[in-house]
């Protein structure tokens, strides 16, 4: 008689443990799904902010280019204008990476291509901010 109770209790404990393990696995998978959704939302927000920043920089660069295009320019202003035009081309290539030069992307895997565009963004943003600062300083000063 005691043997039957021992088997019944052992079976009850084993089934309870199996249910708890199954529940733990389900909660972990649900947590993973929520974490993944959060990461997607964060990436979406980051992409939107980056896109807005690029658009703002392009608009400001176009405005400065138009300002320098109208009227007489000094040699320094001419150089700034050339740099702004180069920046505009680079910003356009960032907006349309699939249309970027095939020479840059031929033979690279996807990760190398992503790194190439990230480096290009960093290379562009620094000089753009410097050019904008100089141009605004020239306009205000």
Swiss-Prot record:
Keywords: Amidation, Amphibian defense peptide, Antibiotic, Antimicrobial, Cleavage on pair of basic residues, Fungicide, Pharmaceutical, Secreted, Signal
Major site of localization recorded for this protein: secreted
InterPro entries tied to this protein: Bombinin
Propeptide: 19-43, 74-123
The name this protein goes by in its record: Bombinins BLP-7/H-BO
Any one GO cellular component localisation term in the record: extracellular region
Subcellular location: Secreted
Modified sites of kind Leucine amide: 140
UniProt tissue specificity: Expressed by the skin glands.
Additional facts recorded: BLP-7 is also encoded by another gene from the same species (AC Q9DET7).
Cleaved signal peptide residues: 1-18
The family this protein is said to belong to: Belongs to the bombinin family.
List of residues that carry Asparagine amide: 70
Organism encoding this protein: Bombina orientalis (Oriental fire-bellied toad)
């Amino acid at each position: 008689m005691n043997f039957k109770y021992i088997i019944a209790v052992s079976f009850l404990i084993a089934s309870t443990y199996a249910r708890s393990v199954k529940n733990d696995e389900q909660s972990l998978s649900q947590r993973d799904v929520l974490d993944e959704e959060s990461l997607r939302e964060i990436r979406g927000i980051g992409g939107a902010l980056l896109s807005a920043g690029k658009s703002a920089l392009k608009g400001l660069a176009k405005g400065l280019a138009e300002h320098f295009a109208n009227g007489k320019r000094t040699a320094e202003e001419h150089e700034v204008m050339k740099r702004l035009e180069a920046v505009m081309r680079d910003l356009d290539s960032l907006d349309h990476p699939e249309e970027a030069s095939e020479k840059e992307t031929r033979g690279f895997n996807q990760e190398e291509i992503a790194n190439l565009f990230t480096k290009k963004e960093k290379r562009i943003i620094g000089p753009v901010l410097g050019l904008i600062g100089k141009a605004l300083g020239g306009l205000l000063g």
